Regions:
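Phosphate- and other anionic-substrate recognition elements at nucleic-acid/protein interfaces
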Residues: 1-135
Length: 135
C-alpha cells in the first residue's frame, strides 16, 4: 500500500508518501504544495509517479479533519478516485505523544505522523464519503 499523509492548513498543505511494505519513501521529507488546484495537481502527479515507480496501485490518503481547510483538497482527491481517510486530530496527537511516532510537532513531521497513523490503523479506518443533501 502507498500511504499518503497530508497535513492540511489554510494556505498550504504538506504531504509525505511511503510504500508501507518496503518502507520506500517518495522524498526524505514532506513536500509542500499550495492550497489551490495547481497544488492539488502536483500532488496527483507525484502520487501517480510514485505508484508507477513502486508498481503499487493500492493508494490510501489520510488527512486530519481541520475546520474547512480540507474541503477543496478532498473534493479534488475524490474526483480523481482516491481513497481518502479522515482522521481525528486527537488520535494522531495521542499517537505522537505515546511515542509510537515522532514526538515533535511541526508541519514537516505532522504529515509523516499522519502517514504512519494511516499505515498502523488502515484496517480500522473507513473511506470518507461526501455528505449528500437531498430536497
Amino acid at each position: 500500500m502507498i500511504a499518503v499523509g497530508i497535513d492540511v492548513a489554510s494556505k498550504k498543505h504538506d504531504y509525505f508518501m511511503i510504500q508501507s511494505e518496503t518502507g520506500l519513501t517518495f522524498r526524505r521529507s514532506s513536500v509542500t504544495i499550495e492550497n489551490n488546484e495547481s497544488g492539488y495537481k502536483k500532488l496527483h502527479e507525484d502520487i501517480q509517479a510514485f505508484s508507477g515507480a513502486t508498481g503499487d496501485s493500492d493508494i490510501r490518503i489520510g488527512l486530519e479533519s481541520t475546520g474547512i481547510y480540507h474541503t477543496n483538497i478532498i473534493a479534488f482527491l475524490i474526483t480523481h478516485d482516491y481513497e481518502v481517510m479522515m482522521i481525528n486530530p486527537i488520535l494522531t496527537n495521542m499517537a505522537r505523544k505515546s511515542g509510537k511516532v515522532h514526538s515533535q510537532k511541526n508541519d514537516n513531521l505532522d504529515s509523516q505522523v499522519i502517514c504512519k497513523y494511516l499505515i498502523d490503523n488502515s484496517d480500522e479506518l473507513t473511506p470518507y464519503t461526501p455528505i449528500l443533501y437531498h430536497r
